[in-house]
Regions:
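Short secondary-structure boundary/capping segments
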Residues: 20, 113-114, 213
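P-loop NTPase catalytic phosphate-binding loop
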Residues: 1-108, 121-125, 129-199, 203-208, ...
Length: 247
């Protein structure tokens, strides 16, 4: 199997070192509006598109902005989509059921389901905070969605599942499942306190300063491996809409 399926390349960091983000790890992307989160998701999808076409990766997309971001992507790449909270609940139930099926089928046989056995299930979530926060009836739905997503994050990696979630809000109230993401990327944020929420104290102490990223540098990003605490600073290449439509 092509090793490229397991890496997302974002060019080079400020020291000229390659920026290689593991594609098989739950990832949280945090950044203000206009900070360039689309460059991160676009780069991820561009890298994975050949493997989606080969049936080695299966993309599900939740975009609670009515599909305005995901709608730019070649629809042939999307297995299932959800543009509303109610649709997201249905998708998450089906996704969680598939995780259970894989656990039952492969328990005692393998420790990790790999793409040559079953397609990697890539769940991309745009505006993830809107999935976990709600008012009135939506609050009940958001609570259910959070529980389902928690189940997927906890059990999913061994079953060949990767969740990539994007949010503007790093606060725990908005992203209660933040600890479930061992890999973090932060674009422009408002303050050091937001950076510590998004990336953790170790990353900031090791030099990550996303609150200093200029507003006119979209795609500029700090990447943190939460296990090692290592940080890299880079600017993700811009992926235009025409490229997304023709992937």
């Amino acid at each position: 199997m092509d090793a490229a399926i397991d890496v997302i390349g974002y060019g080079r960091d400020q020291f000229g070192r390659p920026v290689v983000v593991p594609a098989n790890t739950h990832t949280l992307v945090t950044g203000l509006t206009g900070s360039g989160k689309g460059s991160i998701s676009g780069g991820w999808l561009k890298s994975q598109a050949p493997f989606i076409a080969k049936g080695l990766v299966q993309l599900d997309y939740i975009d609670l902005k009515g599909g305005m971001e995901a709608g730019m992507l070649n629809p042939k790449l999307i297995h299932r989509h959800a543009w509303s909270l109610s649709e997201a609940l249905t998708l998450l139930h089906e996704f969680d059921d598939e995780v259970t099926r894989r656990q039952d089928q492969y328990r005692g046989i393998v420790r990790t389901v790999t793409p040559d056995m079953e397609p990697r299930m890539l769940l991309m979530i745009d505006e993830a905070a809107e999935l976990t926060i709600g008012i009135g009836k939506a609050k009940q739905d958001a609570t259910e969605a959070t529980a389902l997503l928690d189940s997927i994050l906890r059990r999913g990696r061994s079953c060949g599942v990767v969740v990539v979630a994007m949010t503007q809000d790093p606060r725990v109230q908005a992203m209660p499942l933040r600890p479930r993401f061992p890999q973090r990327l932060a674009l422009r944020l408002n303050s050091e306190s937001e950076a510590r929420m998004a990336l953790g104290d170790t990353a900031v102490d090791n030099g990550a300063t996303p609150w200093l990223i200029p507003a006119d540098r979209p795609g500029t990003c700090w990447y943190v491996d939460m296990d090692s605490g290592s940080v890299q600073f880079f600017r993700a290449p811009y992926v235009d809409d025409d490229t997304l439509r023709t992937l």
